[in-house]
């Protein structure tokens, strides 16, 4: 399992200073409909769950050991985002943290659904601020402390989390050929990009900026310059 050490170090340093991609379906177009799985509203990007997500996932082999580690880590990373945003909302009472925390809950459920689809059972979630990987517990405490300094620092914490999510998902997508993982992770990446745009917009309104710590500056600039991503719709056979 990948370490969160670099993420932890950056947090300490700071403290000191829609829809899914298409799946090919060989069926008559007259029997199909466009089905959204990634739901983009304003600055918040959620997964439409249940039958929509299940229908989008293609048949896939069971997860390999490395893919199991990848998914377990991503489940914890998405939970970190939700837990930090929930706690920072209690501190600052600003709508963006409420909205994005709710969106992150759907991201967690999407990863859990993916894990179950691939035959994994370690899908349990601990209470807010508690994680199976103790490094995430340490990181949660550091990020909450940093985000409690000021509203600007809270938005920078949000940007850092989304920055790391984009980097990790992009890396993971290069290390798997599993179609279901690629489908979900592509849209986690889109969602994190949308949330990074949202936090950057809030920072700009406060007259400050965020410097990316994981993705490179060129990638960050491209994300910020791009409109909110809606993704592609997949085709679902009516009645299924």
Please identify what each model-predicted range represents.
Residues 36-240:
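All-alpha RGS (Regulator of G-protein Signaling) helical domain and cognate RGS-like helical scaffolds
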Residues 1-7, 13-57:
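Bacterial Sec-dependent N-terminal signal peptides
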